[in-house]
Amino acid sequence: MKLLSLLMLAGIAQAIVPPREPRPPTGGGNKLLTYKECVPRATISPRSTSLAWINSDEDGQYISQSDDGALILQNIVTNTNKTLVAADKVPKGYYDYWFKPDLSAVLWATNYTKQYRHSYFANYFILDIEKGSLTPLAQDQAGDIQYAQWSPVDNSIAYVRGNDLYIWNNGTTKRITENGGPDIFNGVPDWVYEEEIFGDRFALWFSPDGEYLAYLRFNETGVPTYTIPYYKNKQKIAPAYPRELEIRYPKVSAKNPTVQFHLLNIASSQESTIPVTAFPENDLVIGEVAWLSSGHDSVAYRAFNRVQDREKIVSIKVESKESKVIRERDGTDGWIDNLLSMSYIGDVNGKEYYVDISDASGWAHIYLYPVDGGKEIALTKGEWEVVAILKVDTKKKLIYFTSTKYHSTTRHVYSVSYDTNVMTPLVNDKEAAYYTASFSAKGGYYILSYQGPNVPYQELYSTKDSKKPLKTITSNDALLEKLKEYKLPMVSFFEIKLPSGETLNVKQRLPPNFNPHKKYPVLFTPYGGPGAQEVSQAWNSLDFKSYITSDPELEYVTWTVDNRGTGYKGRKFRSAVAKRLGFLEAQDQVFAAKELLKNRWADKDHIGIWGWSYGGFLTAKTLETDSGVFTFGISTAPVSDFRLYDSMYTERYMKTVELNADGYSETAVHKVDGFKNLKGHYLIQHGTGDDNVHFQNAAVLSNTLMNGGVTADKLTTQWFTDSDHGIRYDMDSTYQYKQLAKMVYDQKQRRPERPPMHQWSKRVLAALFGERAEE
């Protein structure tokens, strides 16, 4: 094992002076974390402040909220502030707000009702700041508006209601589309596009000059319907017949929603349908839309084929409506991620460019691409990855971004000039740390957020001087003082090397009173999905994993291992799992467990694994290997067969069933011997109202195991009535975590020998499965 760090107390490089001394959360007191402090969510945690930067003539202005709820305009340059919205003008119970670009009005969302992961319904109101008047966006609204957004330059608001698009302007509303309904979505995504493609609730984009609106129309006609029953439906007395929610949910190889591209001239209300010919209609996914001009000359979309291993960037000239493929790529060695990173740059040496991230070289890096097509210009390179573009400053010709240059578990903030190609760190990039930043509208200032591994903080900087902060935004001094009362888990990060040569990142938590001469139970806590990352230098949440490490009756060591297929270690590392999800990932977890057992303190009779969602699937696949290393497992909301999951996620990694039938059969959890041979127990938890990973997965998995001969002393299935993927309905999470705590406690108490079995149970098992029950 190559030790990378222990709380990362690294030396300080001379190039960049750090904003403050490291403040490691080492505790120093005698208190141990308790269940109530950690579960179901961490109560001892860092605070962070989210600032709404304002795009005005003067850079460095942002909105903050006072203790009484008033909205304050802060000016960094003049160090002054002004109350824009008094506390008594703030609607009670509002959910969110957005300022008009000229700060003369505020758009409020109230009466929030959650729909899916990102989408919600609400009422919207417009507050005229000067007059103090509050006007409904739609006079007859009934908590049914799906999305609303200010134009970047004028008084217009685009909004979606009943899946139809509307334009509001100075109190006058124009309905743009008339065909919205259960199967037609204008300007908002359907379920699968929201969940798997955009990761957001809108599908409309104003041009920079506000004169045009690009939007997508989704047609779900013919997409199969999945029905979710709600047994209680938030009622005190359950209805005799459950409410049934019908969702158009395309599973693997089923019909996908089709998508159309539309342009709207806002002044004339003239709408144009732009033919999308990058791929056939039934083989098309639109992943991104971006304006490639400072006005409205050109707009582009990113098109994928159905299985997302081929990509075309198509530019549309707005006036002529002509389309042109300006870039394409073959990614059939794996898949192509939809990074949503296109941004217009403008003129560079007499030619117009846009910026994007691509991993075509094997590592994700920043490139300039000509707007009209042509040879790209690489701005970053190396065996590390750009994680995100934070800001493009066209005046200074700088792109700000975060990367893994120091190590795949870290994040540092840099700028790169697209004039000189010089890359400059904004932080000390010679130490293991996790940073991000939020830049002002014109790029002159930024909030630097240090997120770990030490106690997080936020500070304000000018881009002219990254060495000296202008002010502290969030110090978390109170958290640091609080932590001094505690004796905390000892966290370390290291790598283990596979026989094939790849290295896996590991995060280890040891009990606060760890004694290397004692034996400790261990719980592996993977997620492990494609492109994901669990092992990072971000703040170690004092959650359930920290609790089971701290409780004197439990004292578990936890290992989190990022297996092959996870993110930020290059395309080859990610793509290794293509067409066979769960195979290499499970091998890697087993290998890591065997490496763990080289430690004398690891109790080989009490090695568990627990995961949620993809992690629950990986838990089952790991136990399925029948390695004998793991003695118990817990799968929360798991996929059990990817033929039961949605098409746009699954086919990206597995292709269609027609192309990869054997791969799907092997990926499904289907072998039972590993479960039958467990020394301990296997627990499945799932919410019956899960609209993402359907309860069907848990039902099929438990049936497979029961029919395969897994006995009642080895298997428990726990459902949570009406709960979604997060298991939060009606205090379900409280029960869930108590069950988890009981499970790990019982497994620690379990002795290696088989518990006694009643004679009746022996006879029944023998009759059912033809087994000879041991005396």
Swiss-Prot record:
The keyword Aminoacyl-tRNA synthetase does not apply. GO terms for cellular component: extracellular region; plasma membrane. It catalyses: Release of an N-terminal dipeptide, Xaa-Yaa-|-Zaa-, from a polypeptide, preferentially when Yaa is Pro, provided Zaa is neither Pro nor hydroxyproline. Pfam families: DPPIV_N, Peptidase_S9. Glycans are attached at residues 81, 111, 170, 219. Its EC number is 3.4.14.5. It is found in: Secreted. The keyword Endoplasmic reticulum does not apply. Keywords: Aminopeptidase, Glycoprotein, Hydrolase, Protease, Secreted, Serine protease, Signal, Virulence. It is an enzyme of class 3 (hydrolase). The active site is at residues 613, 690, 725. One of its GO terms (biological process) is proteolysis. InterPro entries: AB_hydrolase_fold, Pept_S9_AS, Peptidase_S9_cat, Peptidase_S9B_N, Serine_Prot_S9B/DPPIV. Residues 1-15 form the signal peptide. GO terms for molecular function: aminopeptidase activity; dipeptidyl-peptidase activity; serine-type endopeptidase activity. Belongs to the peptidase S9B family. PANTHER family: DIPEPTIDYL PEPTIDASE 4-RELATED, PROTEASE FAMILY S9B,C DIPEPTIDYL-PEPTIDASE IV-RELATED. Extracellular dipeptidyl-peptidase which removes N-terminal dipeptides sequentially from polypeptides having unsubstituted N-termini provided that the penultimate residue is proline. Contributes to pathogenicity. This is Dipeptidyl peptidase 4. It comes from Trichophyton tonsurans.
